[in-house]
From Swiss-Prot:
In the N-terminal section; belongs to the complex I 30 kDa subunit family. In the C-terminal section; belongs to the complex I 49 kDa subunit family. The gene is nuoC. It is found in: Cell inner membrane. PROSITE patterns: COMPLEX1_49K (PS00535). Its EC number is 7.1.1.-. It comes from Blochmanniella pennsylvanica (strain BPEN). NDH-1 shuttles electrons from NADH, via FMN and iron-sulfur (Fe-S) centers, to quinones in the respiratory chain. The immediate electron acceptor for the enzyme in this species is believed to be ubiquinone. Couples the redox reaction to proton translocation (for every two electrons transferred, four hydrogen ions are translocated across the cytoplasmic membrane), and thus conserves the redox energy in a proton gradient. It catalyses: a quinone + NADH + 5 H(+)(in) = a quinol + NAD(+) + 4 H(+)(out). Keywords: Cell inner membrane, Cell membrane, Membrane, Multifunctional enzyme, NAD, Quinone, Translocase, Transport, Ubiquinone. This is NADH-quinone oxidoreductase subunit C/D.
Length: 596
């Protein structure tokens, strides 16, 4: 974490030695137009006026060592927030999170908005992938983005009323009035289901054109979940397509405002339901930043060990289902059997299989069981042989290679423009793995390589990178097995939740703390924190705001699959329907990760 508390006479925290980009910004814009915000995010956060958004973002994207990727864009309802000392007056805030690969650095631009003038210009002309993020921000907060090409609902149904992430909006179903389906409501709902190509941005280029429209999904086996793609076809050729998401939306960010810091942990498992403990990591680390908790080394290694086991399991499922999409039926049945062996290890350690909810604020739920080394040893001896079997039997098959090579291809520029992370980005030749570039939880102490591609990310290079990542995860697990630190499985920090059982049985104060933290939740100091990790499908992160309460004031979950699906039309236009199936299988996504 970087300290940016030292203010100069202009009221702007000038820490130019730490953030060289400030020198560049102040050479073009007046420093009085910037307000720096100190947080626990470890990221430079700057507040600017709304009329400066496009000039500032354009400058950041085109400067030397540019902030080339729009990583995230969303909003905050500030109206009930108490701890806002030193920040500009704001009822609602829009934030833009940019990443510079060359600098290995981030910057967050925040724009304050008042309720009576809740609008801002779209930045789609600067960052193409802002399109979906702005649509989601509009439908969740009611913030209007001027000149947006298609400002319509994206997550919620078309006939939905209200803005769910506003503070006055109910957080529980029981807070709504009883549902009554009137004839008028039914007619509106049915009308919303009518397909009108113009409403989806699909148009004829001339009056003589006569294209066919086809719904792929939302219940097609090759769309990997409840996901619909509307195709505009000229024969078998895809002229245009529009992804239709939101069927799996559960309001995960809204739930974060009603659950305690501790009781929200099970929800993190279900954001991307195949990742298990991998999904718990960014949330737990972000909360620990807010609480000021440093965990023991044993906790760090245990967390890495569980994360890599889940990574291998997720990759095995991805590889086998992708092969099934292409036409090879046997691998998926074999892989499900193989994955159970890894689940056996996970269950022996955590007590659960897919959704363990096992990480804790300040540690893990309990220590490793006796005999865990033998279980892991047997698993590590077996995994490489099985992966080698899949490679030799199918992935190196000439028929499969001809079917996958060159399909769904894009270069590094396209990947960065659309916010692609994970194997899709690394296949373009960019070595950007958060475990290496920005180590967390002790990854800096592990020896492993980051597989990258040769410049073009296509349906074959992406799956082969996942294979190499399995081998690297095995290397990491070998080091966990050989170098597991001795020590406690939980920090003795007062905000570690729940506290160590041994202390609670001996000290009445600790017993009271246990009761309060588990029932009401720990009171986390007011601040903002952020943590990104290398998840199974790309970069996943949590941006948390605490207002000094037992629950999060704002929980922003950025998942990798959301931008990956937004990229589909750009990549697949001009291809065949059969190529789309191959491309979809190579992305590696689940709809819970998209819709949250």
């Amino acid at each position: 974490m970087v300290d940016i508390m030292c203010n100069d006479s202009t009221g702007v925290s000038l820490v130019k030695n730490i953030y060289p980009i400030l020198d560049d910004l102040f050479s073009v814009f007046s420093s009085v137009d910037f307000v720096l915000q100190p947080t626990h995010t470890g990221i430079l956060i700057i507040w600017i006026k709304r009329e400066m958004v496009i000039p500032v973002l354009t400058f950041l994207k085109t400067t030397s060592k540019p902030y080339i990727m729009l990583y995230d864009l969303h909003g905050i309802d500030e109206r009930l927030r108490i701890h806002r000392e030193g920040l500009p007056e704001s009822d609602f805030t829009v934030f833009y999170h940019l990443i510079s690969i060359l600098r290995n650095d981030d910057i967050i631009i925040k724009v304050p908005l008042l309720e009576q003038s809740l609008y801002i210009d779209t930045v789609v002309s600067v960052f193409a992938n802002a399109n979906w993020y702005e649509r989601e921000t509009w439908e969740m907060f009611g913030i209007h983005f001027n000149k947006h090409p298609n400002l319509t609902r994206i997550i919620m149904p078309k006939n939905w009323n209200g803005y769910p992430l506003r503070k006055e909006y109910p957080a529980r179903a029981t807070e709504f009035n009883p549902f009554i389906l009137t004839k008028q409501k039914e007619d509106l709902a049915m009308e919303g289901l009518l397909f009108k190509p113009e409403e989806w941005g699909m148009h004829k280029h001339s009056k003589h054109e006569n294209f066919m429209f086809l719904n792929l999904g939302p219940n097609h086996p090759s769309v990997h979940g409840v996901f619909r793609i509307i195709l505009q076809l000229n024969g078998e050729e895809i002229i245009d397509c529009v992804p239709d998401i939101g069927y799996h939306h559960r309001g995960a960010e809204k739930m974060g405002e009603r659950q305690t810091w501790h009781s929200y942990i099970p929800y993190t498992d279900r954001i991307e339901y195949l990742g298990g403990c991998v999904n718990e990591m960014p949330y737990i680390l972000a909360v620990e930043k807010l609480a000021g908790i440093t965990v023991p080394d044993r906790v760090k290694v245990i967390r890495i060990m569980l994360s890599e086991l889940f990574r291998i399991n997720s990759h095995l499922l991805y590889i086998s289902t992708y092969l099934q999409d292409v036409g090879a039926m046997s691998p998926v049945f074999l892989a499900f059997t193989d994955r159970q062996k890894i689940y056996d290890v996970i269950e022996s350690i955590t007590g659960s299989r897919m959704h363990p909810a096992w990480f804790r604020i300040g540690g893990v739920a309990h220590d490793l069981p006796r005999g865990w080394e033998c279980l892991l040893r047997k698993c590590l001896d077996w995994i490489p042989h099985r992966v080698s079997f899949y490679v030799k039997s199918t992935l190196e098959n000439s028929i499969f290679k001809k079917r996958a090579c060159g399909i769904g291809a894009y270069n590094a520029k396209d990947a960065l423009d659309w916010g692609v992370t994970g194997a899709g980005l690394r296949a373009t030749g960019i070595e950007f793995d958060i475990r290496k570039s920005r180590p967390y939880s002790g990854y800096e102490n592990f020896d492993f390589d980051v597989p990258i591609g040769n410049g073009i990310s296509d349906s074959y290079s992406r799956v082969m990178l996942k294979v190499e990542e399995i081998y690297q995860s095995v290397r990491i697990l070998e080091q966990c097995l050989q170098n597991m630190p001795i020590g406690p499985f939980k920090s003795d920090h007062p905000l570690a939740t729940p506290p160590m059982k041994e202390y609670a049985l001996q000290h009445i104060e600790t017993l009271i703390t246990h009761f309060l933290q588990v029932s009401w939740g720990p009171v986390i100091p007011a601040n903002e924190s952020f943590q990104m990790i290398e998840a199974t499908k790309g970069i996943n992160s949590y941006y948390l705001i605490s207002d000094g309460n037992t629950m999060s004031y704002r929980t922003r979950i950025r998942t990798p699959s959301f931008p990956h699906l937004q990229q589909i039309p750009h990549v697949i236009r001009g291809s065949l329907i059969s190529d789309l199936i191959v491309y979809l299988g190579s992305i590696d996504f689940v709809m819970s990760d998209v819709d949250r």
